[in-house]
UniProtKB/Swiss-Prot annotation:
Species in which this protein is naturally found: Bos taurus
Start and end residues of each stretch annotated as Disordered: 446-475, 498-537
Compartments where found: Cytoplasmic vesicle, Secretory vesicle
Protein name: Oviduct-specific glycoprotein
Transmembrane residue ranges: none
Gene name of the encoded protein: OVGP1
Glycosylated residues (UniProt): N399
Lineage of origin: Eukaryota, Metazoa, Chordata, Craniata, Vertebrata
Keywords assigned: Cytoplasmic vesicle, Disulfide bond, Fertilization, Glycoprotein, Signal
Signal peptide: 1-18
């Protein structure tokens, strides 16, 4: 019996059956009202393989906490979760939609600026006990970022990776992890990234395969459909296969799954199907307070009074009530996406975010974190499951893993102002968070601010095997964790090809240039030309 179990574990390791489950937690989530407020201590440390804290900021080309309270309260609570799960990895993410591109561009523009940033990253991560850095740059070469940032971003990744390796050798500690969140829109991907090089330099890549449709459009569409429809190739499957066809190892690609939905205000209540005419966003949610956006726990309240429908070709649900329409994910659609990830041998899933799931189980009646638990059961804790994967019926060729990296035909032209809302409901929430200047913890362990009454989060008690539980909660069960090797990625001399240049309308694109430089000696001049510069690490 032991021999059989050992053989199964070996097969599991080699066939890629173990997956990452990377989950974001936002530093503005505590400022939401009442039962929607959450702190790091409320997270289940056994639910995800990696937890990512969003977001850090930047000042004078150095990474810094976004708010003083992050450093004093939230960072310690976040990393203390590893005391309960020794296999858990934590990362700090920098960027986001509200962060913009100007500070990234300035930092990337010279080797000395990048060197200053890299040094500050290592110091901050080690000081607070994080295991790695996540870059959430939206987007290199777009939204005011110059075209050369497509390349200087690659230079930064190479310099971060080499510095992380050097620091690990000097300190005899595991190497810091390096990841990035990238667009799932092929238009953005072609202009913003050197995909093959990102695949070499990053430990994993989170594809933002959501916000594919929303209230910025004139007809209803799903936020994150699994599969594409004729005439509309945008889907999670297409985004993942597009990145794979660009040369990124599939085991490094994580499918982004949203724990929220996008809403529309219908033109006519009687026309409520997919691609029905719409005139902007539906009403803001009670807790997230952003038009066109609902957290999953808000959706649970909405669907009780609404009519639900299933999009057969896209494997996702939507609901409508009167003139309000929402496309969202539930446990069933998350299950289909998990099976797709396994079948296509991708590296796992990324969740945006833990704090938008029904984290206490108050709203949906299916227990805490119902959506993320579905992914955990299917991707992380699926040790010896014999459950057969469902069969998918592809509606168009773009859903196939055999697609090429050519541009799909789409009706929307890409501009530097992408014409979409900030991903994941960041816009309103971050501004709210920045107003909380004097958050304190009371002697009873409650959070108090000048605009809020203290909120009690329950008294944690010791449980068997070093875990904790709160009154009324089920004991946590340890799940498998995918170990991350501290070894680095071999990076030799890098051949850089600029590929398609971004040119103004009416001008012809120049011939793609090739620049060959030894690893670690790259910089960029103000006009975008690559030159060499000796590393000073």
């Amino acid at each position: 019996l032991l021999l059989c179990v050992g053989l199964l574990l070996v097969l599991k390791h080699h066939d890629g059956a173990a997956h990452k489950l990377v989950c974001y937690f936002t530093n503005w989530a505590f400022s939401r009202p009442g039962p929607a407020s959450i702190l790091p201590r409320d997270l289940d440390p056994f639910l995800c393989t990696h937890l990512v804290f969003a977001f850090a900021s930047m000042s004078n080309n150095q990474i810094v906490p976004k708010d003083p309270q992050d450093e004093k309260i939230l960072y310690p609570e976040f990393n203390k979760l590893k005391e309960r799960n020794r296999g858990l990895k934590t990362l700090l993410s920098i960027g986001g939609w509200n962060f913009g591109t100007v500070r990234f561009t300035t930092m990337l523009s010279t080797f000395s600026n990048r060197e200053r940033f890299v040094s500050s990253v290592i110091a901050l991560l080690r000081t607070h006990g994080f295991d790695g850095l996540d870059l959430f740059f939206l987007y290199p070469g777009l939204r005011g970022s110059p075209a050369r940032d497509r390349w200087t971003f690659v230079f930064l990744l190479e310099e971060l990776l080499q510095a992380f390796k050097n620091e690990a050798q000097l300190t005899m500690r595991p190497r810091l992890l390096l990841s990035a969140a990238v667009s799932g829109d092929p238009h953005v991907v072609q202009k913003a990234y050197e995909a093959r090089l990102l695949g070499r330099l990053l430990d994993f890549i989170s594809v933002l395969s959501y916000d594919l449709h929303g209230s910025w459009e004139k007809v209803t569409g799903h936020n994150s459909p699994l599969f594409s429809l004729p005439g509309d190739p945008k889907s999670s499957a297409y985004a993942m296969n597009y990145w794979r066809q660009l040369g990124v190892p599939p085991e490094k690609l994580l499918m982004g799954l949203p724990t929220y939905g996008r809403t529309f205000h219908l033109l006519k209540a009687s026309q409520n199907e997919l691609r029905a005419q719409a005139v902007g966003p539906a009403s803001p949610g009670k807790y997230t307070k952003q038009a066109g956006f609902l957290a999953y726990y808000e959706i649970c309240c909405f669907v009780r009074r609404a009519k639900k429908r299933w999009i057969n070709d896209q494997y996702v649900p939507y609901a409508f009530k009167g003139k309000e329409w929402v496309g969202y994910d539930d446990a069933i659609s998350f299950g289909y996406k998990a099976f797709f990830i396994k079948r296509e041998h991708f590296g796992g899933a990324m969740v945006w975010t833990l704090d938008l799931d029904d984290f206490r189980g108050y709203f949906c009646g299916t227990g805490p974190f119902p959506l993320v638990h579905t992914l955990n059961n299917l991707l992380v804790n699926d040790e010896f499951s014999s459950t057969p994967s469902p069969k998918f019926w592809f509606s168009t060729a773009v859903n196939s893993s055999r697609i090429g990296p050519e541009m799909p035909t789409m009706t929307r032209d890409l501009t530097t102002g992408l014409g979409i809302l900030p991903p994941g409901g960041e816009a309103v929430a971050t501004e709210t968070h920045r107003k909380s200047e004097t958050m304190t913890i009371t002697p009873k362990g409650e959070i108090a601010t000048p605009t809020r009454t203290p909120l009690s989060f329950g008294r944690h008690t010791a449980a068997p095997e070093g875990k904790t539980e709160s009154p009324g909660e089920k004991p946590l069960t340890t799940v498998g964790h995918l170990a991350v090797s501290p070894g680095g990625i071999a990076v030799g001399p890098v051949r850089l090809q600029t590929g398609q240049k971004v040119t103004p309308p009416g001008r012809k694109a120049g011939v793609p240039e090739k620049v060959t430089t030894p690893s670690g000696k790259m910089t960029v001049t103000p006009d975008g030309r690559a030159e060499t510069l000796e590393r000073r690490l």
